[in-house]
């Protein structure tokens, strides 16, 4: 009986499986965290590109009747992977914020600055833990000279 007990104590069978079971949750947490961060970074790049497309569209909209509508449409078209209902857009022309076509039309003067700021909510939840409990918001801003 003593010899079988000694053999059991000295045996290394199953040690690798136990070590793997101990380290697996840590590895999964790191892997899922990398995935979440990658998704947030991808969303940020798409949002930045959408803001740039919107600012360019706005800067080239002098002389058209729908500069604000064209700008928001360009932003939504440039962000196909994002939920466009959650994208918040702020359009500023010549220092004045505009939220309609008529408001933008009066301020679109050649040589002035057209600025588009976009924001989008993000989620940083990894394995049930929210790493941004107060909320995470991605934002991008681009300015162009009105042509």
What residues fall within each predicted segment?
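Short amphipathic secondary-structure patches
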Residues: 49, 54-119
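Low-complexity, S/T/G/P-rich flexible repeat/linker segments used as non-globular hinges
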Residues: 115-147
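Residue-level preference for short coil/turn positions at secondary-structure junctions
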Residues: 10, 110-112, 138
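Alpha-helical assembly-interface signal, strongest on the long, hydrophobic N-terminal helix that forms
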Residues: 1-78
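Low-complexity, intrinsically disordered short peptide segments enriched in small/polar/basic residues
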Residues: 2, 6, 12, 43, ...
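Transmembrane beta-barrel outer-membrane domains
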Residues: 21, 109-111, 133
């Amino acid at each position: 009986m003593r010899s079988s007990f000694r053999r059991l104590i000295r045996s290394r069978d199953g040690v690798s499986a136990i070590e793997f079971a101990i380290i697996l949750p840590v590895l999964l947490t790191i892997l899922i965290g990398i995935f979440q961060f990658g998704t947030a970074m991808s969303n940020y790049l798409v949002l930045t590109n959408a803001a740039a497309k919107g600012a360019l569209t706005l800067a080239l909209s002098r002389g058209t009747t729908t500069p604000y509508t064209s700008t928001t449409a360009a932003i939504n078209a440039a962000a196909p992977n994002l939920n466009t209902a959650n994208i918040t857009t702020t359009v500023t022309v010549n220092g004045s914020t505009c939220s309609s076509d008529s408001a933008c039309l009066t301020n679109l003067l050649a040589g002035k600055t057209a600025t588009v700021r976009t924001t989008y909510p993000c989620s940083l939840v990894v394995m049930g833990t929210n790493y941004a409990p107060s909320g995470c918001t991605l934002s991008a801003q681009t300015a162009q000279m009105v042509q």
